[in-house]
Amino acid sequence: MFVVLLLTSCDMFEAHPYDAHVSGEREVNKRNIARIEDSLRGKKSFRFAMISDTQRWYDETEDAVKALNRRDDIDFVMHGGDLSDFGMTREFIWQRNILSKLKVPYICAIGNHDHLGTGEHVFREIFGDTNFAFTAGNVRFIVLNTNALDYDYSEPIPDFFFLDGQKADFPAEAEKTIFLMHCAPGSEIFNNNVMNVFEQYVLSFPNTLFCLYGHSHNISVKDLFGDGLLYYECPNIAKRIYLLFTINENDYTYEAVEY
């Protein structure tokens, strides 16, 4: 009797939600960055969309992918972080599998919820580094981990050493800069002790156009520091809105698109 019970009970065991065992595609950002850079090399005009905070809302994320795929004028998609709600491995895998249906390449920033449990490890396994940069046409995109509270301020978040390196190695073909982060300065998650220093770093890059962020599940356009630099906030995917940016040679346009 004991043997029978032991054998039948084996089927009841499931992987722990934080086991961090990743199946399927990895290094998504690296692979998609190569596609973006190759397709836009030498161009001075392009268009990208932004979505953010897709945690829990799998149906809405599926609908966003379908809406974006109906267009033929978008070059890539940026995700502002919080793919997961609890940092569980399966949440990242589910989101990756949905986003991989996009016809265009996409990249993901890390959100504060993505740090929970073993979330940061899984994010790195599937998507890659939490600070990274790439060049689309003549624009340098700098993607930052700004979730300082999740480290209890024990690590340099935002990472000014990374920013120093990016400025020192700024590509010759890049003429403008755009920043993407999950939490903006002033957020309870941001290290607001250095918010003014951070803004000066951002402004010190060549022709900084604007900053993008998510986190608060709202849509807004704010001049956070009163210096003319706009911060565009992308709402959570439950709002069924994505942001659309068209970069032109001498300017850019912005649109919030409902679907």
Regions from the PLM with identified roles:
Residues 14-30, 51, 134, 220-259:
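Binuclear metal-dependent phosphoesterase catalytic core
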Residues 69-76, 151-230:
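His/acidic metal-ligating clusters that form di-metal
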Residues 1-10:
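Sec-dependent bacterial lipoprotein signal peptides
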Residues 10-94:
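N-terminal active-site segment of His-dependent metallophosphoesterases
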Residues 38-49, 133-143, 170-178, 224-230, ...:
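Beta-strand-turn-beta hairpins that frame and shape the catalytic cleft
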Residues 53, 81-82, 111-112, 182, ...:
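Active-site glycine-centered loops adjacent to acidic/histidine catalytic or metal-binding residues
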Residues 61-136:
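Core catalytic region of metal-dependent phosphoesterases/phosphodiesterases
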Residues 26-36, 59-66, 90-95, 118-132, ...:
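Alpha-helical scaffolding within the catalytic cores
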